[in-house]
Amino acid sequence: MSSSSSMDLLMCLLLLISPVVLAKSSSTVPAIFTFGDSIFDAGNNHYNKNCTAQADFPPYGSSFFHRPTGRFTNGRTVADFISEFVGLPLQKPFLELQIQILNGTSNFSNGINFASAGSGLLLDTNKFMGVTPIQTQLQQFQTLVEQNLIEKSIIQESLFLLETGSNDIFNYFLPFRAPTLSPDAYVNAMLDQVNKTIDQIYKLGARRIAFFSLGPVGCVPARAMLPNAPTNKCFGKMNVMAKMYNKRLEDIVNIIPTKYPGAIAVFGAVYGITHRFQTYPARYGFSDVSNACCGNGTLGGLMQCGREGYKICNNPNEFLFWDFYHPTEHTYRLMSKALWNGNKNHIRPFNLMALATNKITF
C-alpha cells in the first residue's frame, strides 16, 4: 500500500471515531460569528418571511432535532459541529436572536449565525428569493458592533467562519439567464467581494478567520434540472469553475496575515474533503454519493425534500446528499472533523483546533 493510501485510510478511521474525542480542546474562543450560505444557515431564512428559500417543514431536521429548524439538512450543519468542538452552545440565527434580545431573553455573548441559504457573493444571486446576501449579513454585524452590543475583546478572540459562492456558480449555468461575463471574469467578480468581506470583518475586529472553499458544486443532484448537465457523472464545467474560484480564494487567504497585522487565517479545502468521500465512499460509511436521500425525479434532484410527492431513503447516514443541493448530517459531521483536526490536505496552514487555541497578542 502506498504512503498516500495509508494516510487516507488512517484519516478516514480518525473521522469515523467518536466525535466526543475530537470535541475536547482548550479553546480560547469565546464566540463564533458565521457568514455564508446553506452550509452554515441555522434558520435565518425561516425568520425572514420575505424569503422563499425555506427548509422549515418536515423531514428537515428529523435525524437530530426531530423537528424542522430552518437548517437545510436532516440534522446539524458544519457550523453546529464546530460550535460543539469548541465547547459552545449551537449558534442561533441572527434574526431569531434579534427577536429574543428585544424581549430581553437572550444576548450575543456566544456568537451569531448570519448565514442565509441560497445567498451568494454577488448581490443578484437569488435576489428574487429574498435571501440575505453576504453584504447585508456583514452590515447586520457592523450595526451590532457600532452599537456596542458586542464587546471588542470578544470579537478579537472569536472565530469567524465564512463560506459562500456555490450559489453564484450554480446560477451561472441556469438556462434562463445568459452570462454577461466569461467564467474567469465572473470568478474575479466573486473574489472582489471576498476581498471586501475580509477587509470589512478585519476593520470590525476579526482576527481568527477561517474561509472554506466550495465543494464540487457540479455534483449536486440539482444539476438534473440543467438541460446541458450530465446525470451519469458530475458537471465538469461547473466543477472547473468552482476549482478556479477555490485556487484564487486560497491565494487570498494565504496573504491575510501579511496584509492584515495581527490576523491569522486558514483555508478549509472542502472540495478535496468531499472528493475523498466520493472516491472512497465505503471507507466513510456511504452507500450512495450521487443521489439525494430526500427528493424525487432523476438523482432525487428534481424536487425539494418535503414537497408534495417527495420520497425519502431509509438511512440518511449512508447518503452523501440529503436533498437536491445539500449534504446529510453524516457528511457534515465528517467534513467538520476534517476541518477541526485534519491535516494540510483538509485545511491549511493549520486546522481549526489550532486556530481556536492559538494565542493572539494585540
From Swiss-Prot:
InterPro entries: GDSL (IPR001087), GLIP1-5/GLL25 (IPR044552), SGNH_hydro_sf (IPR036514), SGNH_plant_lipase-like (IPR035669)
Chief location bin: secreted
Origin superkingdom: Eukaryota
Organism of derivation: Arabidopsis thaliana
Compartment list: Secreted
Glycosylation sites: 50, 103, 107, 195, 296
One Gene Ontology CC term in the entry: extracellular region
GO molecular function: lipase activity
Alphabetical UniProt keywords: Glycoprotein, Hydrolase, Lipid degradation, Lipid metabolism, Secreted, Signal
Family: Belongs to the 'GDSL' lipolytic enzyme family.
UniProt protein name: GDSL esterase/lipase 6
CDD domains: SGNH_plant_lipase_like
Residues annotated as the enzyme's active site: 38, 323, 326
This enzyme's EC code(s): 3.1.1.-
